[in-house]
């Protein structure tokens, strides 16, 4: 067994003899080690010499807290030999022991004796400006395959005017003196020391997202002093992996030394080795003692801790053993296989979003040290090779975040005592604002001239009271300052709920926390809201983010590169619905706020051709999902965007435009058709004659609806489009796409016209619409006018095999026909959804003609002419009620007609009467034309049933409608009361014992039916065409229970 001793000292504070005075140093100071230091320091070559100015402000009667040695009468130049802990000079974090003092307030010390220097410092006044000479830190290490540079984000809280470390180096006019900004001292007990991640020799890359590449020492110090109470530092450090560890093939003994009180920085978990339980390193905290040693890695098995075997130890016991070590720990480990360790840095991915360079990989050469060796990407990240993200914070002006890898022990909220004002509870709830992504008015110019648009989304995070949500915010200069703009996400902890959700990125604006707007409050209140939410383990954030739209492909094949982090989804959902062999997979959904969504180039409906150059033509969907999950760092997607899926289709002879309709309490007068397949188009299949939509002149049958009230229908089935229309409100905005290179419904020879009634066979559109009611069910469709009219005959019938064919919207002479022209398309409750579109007859199929072309309805016993005139006038009056929005009066009239004394009424008000158009004999019989041109009839029946005394039921079962509310007869028992009373399957229950059930579902209707007693009175609507081809059947095993 090999023994490797790796010791890492965090720093030793050397005790010195008591000072003779506040600034003087006795003769002992020049002896021993200090004398060697003086000799070495007095011979600093010019190329290693740095100069800085230090300004200290001391109170009257107090001292600077530093000890000066040297002078013309002493051994060497004046220098700082000691900094009193807690003194002004030590807390300034601008001086190091060994620095030379060249001047005090402009007075040169070269020719002064030691006592003169001390007197000068005592009497200098409150403001002291020291010119300090120091030795430059060593240059960046040369390229070494065993030295890996890593980066870490560290959040520190300012104490006084410093963060507890001394910074030296920086850019210089003389290139030979240019150095990275290096931490040369970490003050014991200071903020950096208490946090525990920063060590001497670490290189500072950025402060609060401001890159320090090319910054001088003075600029870096000024940036530090201008930071707010809390700042985020991006630091680079080196990890050297010993050859013994790198080439080990068996157990090793690793000895790690640490400062008492500091943590090792590893967390343990349970695993197995050779089918035996084992204690394994789960993860290593970045920049911790263990991480910097390079000897341990995630996945290593710990065999013993300080000689105590872990073979029979539980996870809790092993963790306690590690926590009990003081200065040195001796671990016996079995290194994980080399294949599980990332030995070379991941490929850098850079995205430029502003004038400053932002990057996905935190180690971009232009943002860090001028030396190439500083651009090694880290090889460790929790859960895999993590990639950080950076998003410009437009439109709010704030420093752009440039985060790196996991923050070591960075708290998710300020740790200082907080006393927020109580205004957060009284602040108004945020009013939600919706911006249309379909309008150019929402586009803005982001940093660097990139075109973006902002979107908002809600993110729900589940955390715990101890670790919170892994989210840090930034806003304002002071914590108690009222925010003029929403706070930004400044840091996301790795493997936290905020990172795992995949919807948050650094730079996002947090508009509201649990419904309370952040713009009206302070940072203290925002942090307090997060703390309170952590106690409840859940928070709802409303965030605003930028979506790039500089390049939005409308068609063709292109590639998209997305950064991928292990454990975080890209936000893409792929589908293989109705996919045939050789066809590509379809992106069915993109999660709002995800990495895929923010690119602005991917949309639902895009075809996914390849992932990382792996073609998916013949791959099953499960294989494609597995490929996506296994990708790391960078995912390359090959996408094809078809023109049918594009909103902009000028190249294919189509035009898109927006139409705004105002209901004024009335219906829209349109009928839409589609399927439940997500990417099948939603088509306008019917328009009501002289209805609101038709009167605009901009909407026609065959037009495709792209969006409803700025909500895109891309990837949405018909049922969702129906719901959007039902909740659209008084003003409905439709985005329409019209194909211009072909007629919408081409008229063939023989179509009806004003010159001739019927010359040849009916057009195919009519045949397809009506004949399919006999032979093939059509797709479900809905008239959006129905929901805005309480009684606009939603008892619509069904065509053929349970499908609905839109009614011919022509002017009738009876109120029932007037109502039937506005029937809502109602899909059958038990019919499967179809994937084909069969247009029904619409008003576009019938050119508007004079009323003289229409004959009065034919009846076996025609009534007097006075009755004909009455119905015509009543129909006109009802149309007037529709146009002026008198919906309540219309409902009362319709209800009175529906509840009349007629037991069985056809749609025209008299049994058997149907309007039909006169035709000439041109080879087609009038009977055929009558069958094609007649509107689908609708019958209403009043049925009285008596309960079967033997079975104690009425002999029928009910079921819900497919896409709308409504209760339908499901089955009728043979020789039961329902069959004897004339009830048939697919009858819709409108009333049960004089209670309206039109808007009921089975949950409400079944109790009503059960309480009916021995007599049940029903009012039902029926489509005779649907019933003529169906016979009642006995209930099967899966049928609903008989009522």
Curated annotation (Swiss-Prot):
InterPro entries xref list: GRIP1/2, PDZ, PDZ_6, PDZ_sf
Q: Where is this region: Disordered?
A: 371-450, 745-769, 786-863
Tissue and organ expression note: Brain specific. Isoform 1 is expressed in the olfactory bulb, cortex and hippocampus and was also expressed at lower levels in thalamus, cerebellum and spinal cord. Isoform 3 is expressed in pyramidal cells of cortex and hippocampus, striatum, thalamus, hypothalamus, stellate cells of cerebellum, and brainstem. Isoform 2 and isoform 4 are expressed in cortex, hippocampus, thalamus, cerebellum, brainstem and spinal cord. In hippocampal neurons isoform 4 is found abundantly in spine structures. Isoform 2 is abundant in the cell body and also found in dendritic shafts.
Task: Tell me which Gene Ontology terms the entry assigns under biological process.
Answer: artery smooth muscle contraction; neurotransmitter receptor transport, endosome to postsynaptic membrane; Notch signaling pathway; positive regulation of AMPA glutamate receptor clustering; positive regulation of blood pressure; positive regulation of excitatory postsynaptic potential; positive regulation of neuron maturation; vesicle-mediated transport in synapse
Bias (Basic residues) ranges: 424-434
All copies of domain PDZ, residue ranges: 53-136, 153-239, 253-337, 458-547, 559-643, 658-740, 942-1024
For the modification Phosphoserine, the affected residues are 43
- What PANTHER family has UniProt attached to this entry? GLUTAMATE RECEPTOR-INTERACTING PROTEIN 2 (PTHR46227:SF4), GLUTAMATE RECEPTOR-INTERACTING PROTEIN GRIP (PTHR46227)
What is this protein's name?
Glutamate receptor-interacting protein 2
């Amino acid at each position: 067994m090999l023994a490797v001793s790796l010791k890492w000292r965090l720093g030793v504070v050397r005790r010195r003899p008591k000072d003779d005075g506040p600034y003087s140093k006795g003769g002992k100071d020049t002896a021993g080690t200090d004398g060697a230091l003086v000799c070495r320091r007095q011979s600093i070559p010019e190329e290693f010499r740095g100069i800085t100015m230090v300004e200290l402000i001391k109170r009257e009667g107090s001292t600077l807290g530093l000890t000066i040695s040297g002078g013309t009468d002493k051994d060497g130049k004046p220098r700082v030999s000691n900094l009193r802990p807690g003194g002004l000079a030590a807390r300034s974090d601008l001086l190091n022991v060994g620095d030379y003092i060249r001047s005090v307030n402009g007075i040169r010390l070269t020719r002064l004796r030691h006592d003169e220097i001390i007197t000068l410092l005592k009497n200098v006044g409150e403001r002291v400006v020291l010119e300090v000479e120091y030795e430059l830190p060593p240059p960046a290490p040369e390229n070494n395959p065993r030295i890996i540079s890593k980066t870490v984000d560290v959040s520190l809280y300012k104490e006084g005017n410093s963060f507890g470390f001394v910074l030296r180096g920086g850019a210089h006019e003389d290139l030979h003196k240019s150095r990275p900004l290096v931490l040369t001292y970490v003050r014991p007990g200071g903020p950096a020391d208490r946090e525990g991640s920063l060590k001497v020799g670490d290189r500072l890359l950025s402060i609060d997202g401001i890159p320090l590449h090319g910054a001088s020492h003075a600029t870096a110090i000024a940036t530090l002093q201008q930071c707010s109470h809390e700042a985020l530092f991006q630091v680079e450090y080196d990890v050297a992996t010993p050859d013994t560890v790198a080439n080990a093939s068996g157990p090793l003994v690793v000895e790690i030394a640490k400062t008492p009180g500091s943590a090792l920085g590893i967390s343990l978990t349970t695993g197995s080795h050779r089918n035996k339980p084992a204690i394994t390193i789960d993860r290593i905290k970045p920049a911790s003692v263990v991480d910097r040693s390079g000897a341990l890695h995630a996945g290593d098995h710990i065999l013993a801790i300080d000689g105590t075997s872990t073979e029979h130890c539980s996870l809790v016991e092993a963790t306690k053993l590690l926590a009990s070590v003081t200065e040195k720990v001796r671990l016996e480990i079995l290194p994980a296989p080399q294949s599980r360790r990332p030995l070379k840095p991941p490929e850098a991915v850079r995205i430029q979003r502003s004038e400053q360079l932002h990057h996905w990989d935190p180690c971009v050469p232009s943002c860090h040290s001028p030396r190439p060796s500083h651009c090694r990407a880290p090889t460790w990240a929790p859960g895999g090779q993590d990639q950080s993200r950076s998003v410009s914070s437009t439109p709010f002006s704030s420093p752009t975040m440039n985060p790196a890898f996991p923050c070591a022990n960075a708290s998710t909220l300020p740790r200082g005592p907080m006393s927020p004002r109580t205004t957060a509870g009284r602040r108004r709830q945020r009013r939600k604002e919706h911006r249309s992504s379909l309008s150019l008015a929402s586009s803005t110019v982001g940093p660097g001239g990139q075109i973006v648009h902002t979107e908002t989304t809600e993110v729900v995070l589940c955390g715990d009271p101890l670790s919170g949500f892994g989210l840090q915010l930034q806003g304002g200069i002071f914590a108690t300052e009222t925010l003029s703009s929403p706070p930004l996400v400044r840091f996301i902890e790795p493997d936290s709920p905020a990172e795992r959700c995949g919807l948050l990125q650094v730079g996002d604006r947090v508009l509201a926390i649990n419904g309370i707007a952040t713009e009206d409050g302070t940072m203290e209140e925002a942090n307090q809201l997060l703390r309170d939410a952590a106690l409840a383990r859940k928070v709802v954030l409303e965030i605003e983010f930028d979506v790039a739209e500089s390049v939005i492909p409308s068609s063709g094949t292109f590639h998209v590169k997305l950064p991928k982090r292990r454990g975080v989804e890209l936000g893409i959902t792929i589908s293989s619905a109705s996919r045939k062999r050789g066809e590509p997979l379809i992106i069915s959904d993109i999660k709002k706020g995800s990495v895929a969504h923010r690119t602005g180039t991917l949309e639902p409906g895009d075809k996914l051709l390849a992932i990382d150059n792996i073609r998916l033509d013949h791959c099953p969907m499960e294989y494609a999902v597995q490929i996506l999950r296994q990708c790391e760092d960078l995912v390359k997607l090959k996408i094809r965007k078809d023109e049918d899926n594009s909103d902009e289709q000028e190249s294919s002879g189509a035009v898109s435009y927006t139409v705004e309709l105002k209901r004024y309490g009335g219906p829209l007068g349109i009928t839409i058709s589609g399927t439940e397949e997500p990417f099948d188009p939603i088509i306008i299949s019917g328009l009501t004659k002289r209805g609101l939509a038709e009167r605009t002149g901009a909407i026609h049958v065959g037009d495709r609806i792209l969006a409803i009230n700025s909500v895109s229908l891309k990837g949405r089935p018909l049922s969702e489009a129906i719901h959007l229309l039902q909740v659209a409100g008084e003003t409905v905005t439709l985005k329409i796409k019209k194909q211009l290179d072909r007629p919408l419904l081409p008229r063939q020879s023989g179509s009806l016209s004003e010159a001739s009634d019927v010359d040849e066979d009916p057009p195919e559109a009519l045949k397809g619409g009506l004949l399919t009611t006999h032979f093939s069910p059509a797709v479900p469709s809905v008239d959006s006018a129905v929901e805005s009219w309480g009684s606009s005959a939603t008892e619509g019938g069904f065509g053929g095999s349970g499908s609905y064919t839109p009614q011919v919207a022509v002017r009738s002479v009876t109120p029932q026909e007037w109502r039937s022209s506005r029937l809502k398309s109602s899909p059958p409750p038990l019919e499967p959804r179809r994937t084909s579109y069969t247009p029904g007859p619409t008003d576009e199929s019938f050119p508007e003609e004079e009323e003289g072309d229409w004959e009065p309805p034919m009846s076996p016993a025609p009534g007097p002419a006075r009755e004909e005139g009455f119905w015509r006038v009543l129909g006109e009056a009802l149309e007037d009620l529709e146009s002026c929005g008198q919906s309540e009066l219309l409902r009362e009239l319709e209800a009175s007609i529906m509840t009349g004394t007629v037991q069985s009424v056809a749609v025209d008000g008299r049994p058997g009467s149907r309007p039909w158009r006169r035709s000439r004999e041109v080879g087609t019989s009038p009977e055929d034309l009558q069958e094609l041109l007649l509107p689908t009839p609708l019958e209403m029946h009043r049925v009285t049933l008596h309960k079967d005394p033997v079975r104690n039921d009425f002999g029928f079962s009910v079921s819900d409608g497919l896409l709308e509310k409504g209760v339908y007869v499901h089955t009728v028992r043979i020789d039961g009361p329902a069959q004897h009373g004339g009830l048939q399957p697919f009858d819709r229950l409108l009333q049960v014992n004089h209670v309206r059930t039109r808007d009921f579902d089975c949950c409400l209707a079944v109790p009503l039916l059960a309480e009916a007693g021995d007599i049940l009175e029903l009012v039902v609507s029926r489509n005779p065409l649907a019933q003529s081809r169906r016979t009642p059947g006995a209930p099967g095993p899966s049928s609903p229970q008989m009522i």
